[in-house]
Amino acid sequence: GWFFTLHAIHTMIEGTVAYKNVISNGLVLDKNGNKMSKRLGNAVDPFGALDTYGADAVRWYMLTNSSPWENLKFDPEGVDEVRRKFFGTLYNTYGFFALYANVDGWTGSEPEQASHAAYSEIDRWILSKLNSLIKEVTEAYEAYEPTKAGRAISDFVQDDLSNWYVRLNRKRFWGGEMNADKQAAY
């Protein structure tokens, strides 16, 4: 298989192992769990999926839909849902932040960052959630569980960051002057 071929080629060229660990996905099946086949007409053109949904959405769908070692039921509607729900939410959240950061001239390198004392309860909550996410994702990757890591990131972006933090803090960004509270929100 290609694992051995790539490993052997790299070892011959470089004199070292190409990789120490490999995570491989199972078969990619159609949305009903059947083997894809041109003859049956249920095969998905990978280049068409990439053109329609984008590489990031296809990769994120494949990562978060099932563990890599399990067979994956590929559903184009699922890829579109990932594109809308995860990437759309991430894009809109970043767009909201960038709009107000640019209006306020905030770059993140301001010498007078808000002190932790200025952080509101919700600021401390989102920072706690972020630090917990970092720990959870790191542990998942170290345990070779990328699906668990991806799902945790999706949940954080869609629920904690967008649905709670941004929605409850919009007025802090709308304020006219840069005060400690607004600085803490950034």
Predicted regions and their residues:
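Metal-dependent nuclease catalytic cores in nucleic-acid-processing enzymes
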Residues: 1-15
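Long, charged, mostly alpha-helical binding arms that flank functional sites
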Residues: 16-186
